Amino acid sequence: MGFRRLTCPHLALEGPALTTALVGIGMAFAAPPMPNPNLEDTLLAGSIEGMERDDLRVLAILMTWLGVHAAWINVDRLTTLVGQQSSLRVRAFWGAAAHWLDKDRRFARLSKNYGGPRLDLLATGTDFHLRRAGEDPRFAGGPLRVPAGILRDRKGDVLTPTELARIHGAYRRRILLGPSYRADMWAELDQDPSLSAAELARHTHTADGLLDYLIGANDWC
């Protein structure tokens, strides 16, 4: 069966919409949560905010979130999204994250999205901070140079998996079914069983031809 996946959101979230989406996937910012934002869209938008707009707080909490929740990311989709980015800094960030998460073999392909020299997270002062405090061990040996202490790592800045599963339907379904398009489809159907195939494909960034393959005519639960 031939099919294609609609992996790319129309526009990356930014501003207040991004903040509410980040809260919606379990990050501690002062904003109301967006209901069930797409995980990969939100993670990519957060990395753009951090790397292109130098928002170190977003980047710090994003890294903490990855340390807690990486197992439930659809890495196939994230890899494709990152590969579509023209920003070398965004690609380098995800290459660094994949290097850190290399015990999960799904991240191997993501690490290949950046093949350039090591970049500095900070615009200035990297060498000084490295001499003073050393390197953040999460980034050691990866494509991004980050001095220790620049990106704080506080587990209290993100919800636990149990807490996030209570408020995010797709995350909960991914825990049950695995981090896949199929889990996201079922999460959408949990919210609205009347969705047409076209609507379901659009909501989950999945082309119509994949629906029968993943769900099946009698695969209802």
Roles of regions detected by a PLM:
Residues M1-R132:
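N-terminal, charged low-complexity regulatory/assembly segments
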Residues Q191-S196, C221:
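Secondary-structure boundary elements
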Residues D127-L159:
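Eukaryotic acidic, serine/proline-rich intrinsically disordered low-complexity regions
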Residues I175-A183, S194:
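Short helix-coil-helix linker/hinge
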Residues W186-A187:
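Hydrophobic residues on short alpha-helical segments
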Residues H205-D219:
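Short amphipathic alpha-helical interaction segments
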Residues T160-I175:
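Short, Lys/Arg-enriched N-terminal segment that forms or immediately precedes the first helix
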